[in-house]
């Protein structure tokens, strides 16, 4: 039994006219009659009564019409969904992100992606970098937005999607709070609150590398697993820290960000997926995100600092 036979049958069942149906589906009337005859042979019953004056459905034809219409609708839906899935426009995306990009970068991309891919379902989770790496490698996460750098021996394909400067973060009552720019040597010997290495080793080592290059050994009074918590610790007077500028901008804590005059690396967010064969929906989202974030970067004004 072929789909074209069922479609032809349903069209005749609606028009009750072989000639009119043949015109509608752009098929010769003899060819249409052959399709229906083959369908009746497969069903094992006559579906139409025909004479010179009219065409009508038999009892078998009425029963077949109702079920065939429902079956055809389901099959056409299955075909449509299969094509969407093959083109990366259907499926579920499990996305992880570090807290500092969860409120801005990820929601914007997801919202824009859903406009042209409404049948993709999302599961969004705030996950620390080290756990994201493990989940991506095990296949329990599809896309991760994490802190760079990630180890070169990783089984992940990582692309930098966001860059911003590090700033020195001090309490609003600190002696440097009124300074717009500082050199790191000016804070040598002061207490620092720092990021724990376990949860983002590459990012932790990057921060300590900044101090090492400035020939400073920070006196660490407290550690935290998330950067927003570091900012809160700074506000409470536990110490000072360095952090990405956007974290301070989005914080309500009573802290001040001072630009760092030393030549230091930028803070980077990477978008990570597993290397190798991936679900089409993952590749579709990744390509869309790279294009979208690329346009956003190109539209930003030049940094004049």
Predicted regions and their residues:
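Short helix-boundary/capping micro-motifs
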Residues: 12-28, 54
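Conserved amphipathic alpha-helical core elements
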Residues: 39-40, 113
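A short LG(V/I)-centered, amphipathic sequence patch enriched
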Residues: 40-57
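Central regulatory/effector-binding core of bacterial HTH transcription factors
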Residues: 90-153, 224
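A late-sequence structural motif
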Residues: 105, 194, 248, 255-305
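Acidic, Gly/Pro-rich loop/turn segments at junctions of secondary structure
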Residues: 116, 127-189, 246-252
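Secondary-structure junction motif
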Residues: 147, 180, 190-214, 279-287, ...
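Beta-alpha-beta core module
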Residues: 151-160, 164-165, 228-275
